[in-house]
Amino acid sequence: MTDFPTLPSEFIPGDGRFGCGPSKVRPEQIQAIVDGSASVIGTSHRQPAVKNVVGSIREGLSDLFSLPEGYEIILSLGGATAFWDAATFGLIEKKSGHLSFGEFSSKFAKASKLAPWLYEPEIVTAETGDAPAPQAFEGADVIAWAHNETSTGAMVPVLRPEGSEGSLVAIDATSGAGGLPVDIKNSDVYYFSPQKCFASDGGLWLAAMSPAALERIEKINASDRFIPEFLNLQTAVDNSLKNQTYNTPAVATLLMLDNQVKWMNSNGGLDGMVARTTASSSALYNWAEAREEASPYVADAAKRSLVVGTIDFDDSIDAAVIAKILRANGILDTEPYRKLGRNQLRIGMFPAIDSTDVEKLTGAIDFILDGGFAKK
């Protein structure tokens, strides 16, 4: 067994969870599960106790995102991964266009490409660590990209590209929703999972959908296209408007999510959450730029994520050793995305994470580097 150095106490964060999903959960969210353990958990999801939680989540998210008139919060099971498949059945009419700039933004493009009932999608790519600009695609009735690419820490703004009239804008906000600025009216489907900024468990997808998106879903559902019921977006819409899900949800996840949304809204709403992630990301990137051995992986500062920070280290430093030393001291999940294969750390900076803890994390890395503990 390798002996790792013990970090000085001043460099130990108040909470050592820096993972990019699942992410840090606040104690109050766990207490919400305890409080609902007899009255909500273990009861029917078709009855008021659970339906009221779903309704509270939908109302809270509507407030958080300042939903325009006619938009609805829709939810169903399976996470964003299930939503990609559902979108190929029930959102894309004929053809989609995609921005692909990392592991997760590429997966929706792949799902569309594999769907034999759709035309070949157009895909614009960028090297990992960079991101293409939003753009229209000729003949595409859905334009899709990620607000935040979780694998690389690159973010792309949410806007309606010039010339995109008639196309639905579908934004994968899995790791960005709740921590990045957004004007929802610039998207038609802004979908996400709760295990990132919302500090809950996975297995659920939620989406802010525009009237145009709801109309498209209804139109496709009324066609002769085969749609599996579990992936039927119209089924998700119909159940969501009743504050239900098609099949049984993980009720503890709903309780955690509801508590987090209430916390967000009572602490400044989306602007307050973006202020928190901005403070954390500024602390991380400023440190990396000042440190000779380190540098932000995303070269363009405007594209650097506020919620997922990726930091490269030069060849003289073994970033994997840094992560191991941090883990041995209770600072968890700073390893890079597994498929990226880079000499780097990846740091979650979601709203529940305090910027003071990010500052302590950088101090811990300074201690490791200055002590020569991670030299190759």
Swiss-Prot record:
It is found in: Cytoplasm. Its cofactor is pyridoxal 5'-phosphate. Pathway: Amino-acid biosynthesis; L-serine biosynthesis; L-serine from 3-phospho-D-glycerate: step 2/3; Cofactor biosynthesis; pyridoxine 5'-phosphate biosynthesis; pyridoxine 5'-phosphate from D-erythrose 4-phosphate: step 3/5. L-glutamate binds at residue 46. One of its GO terms (cellular component) is cytoplasm. The keyword Amino-acid biosynthesis applies. It catalyses: O-phospho-L-serine + 2-oxoglutarate = 3-phosphooxypyruvate + L-glutamate; 4-(phosphooxy)-L-threonine + 2-oxoglutarate = (R)-3-hydroxy-2-oxo-4-phosphooxybutanoate + L-glutamate. Pyridoxal 5'-phosphate binds at residues 80-81, 104, 150, 172, 195, 247-248. Disulfide bonds: none annotated. The keyword Amino-acid biosynthesis applies. Its main location: cytoplasm. It is an enzyme of class 2 (transferase). Its EC number is 2.6.1.52. The modification N6-(pyridoxal phosphate)lysine is found at residue 196. Binds 1 pyridoxal phosphate per subunit. Coiled coil: none annotated. One of its GO terms (biological process) is glycine biosynthetic process, by transamination of glyoxylate. Keywords: Amino-acid biosynthesis, Aminotransferase, Cytoplasm, Pyridoxal phosphate, Pyridoxine biosynthesis, Serine biosynthesis, Transferase. One of its GO terms (molecular function) is pyridoxal phosphate binding. Signal peptide: none annotated. HAMAP family: SerC_aminotrans_5 (MF_00160). Catalyzes the reversible conversion of 3-phosphohydroxypyruvate to phosphoserine and of 3-hydroxy-2-oxo-4-phosphonooxybutanoate to phosphohydroxythreonine. NCBIfam families: serC_3. Homodimer. Belongs to the class-V pyridoxal-phosphate-dependent aminotransferase family. SerC subfamily. This is Phosphoserine aminotransferase. It comes from Corynebacterium glutamicum (strain R). The lineage of its organism: Bacteria, Bacillati, Actinomycetota, Actinomycetes, Mycobacteriales. The gene is serC.
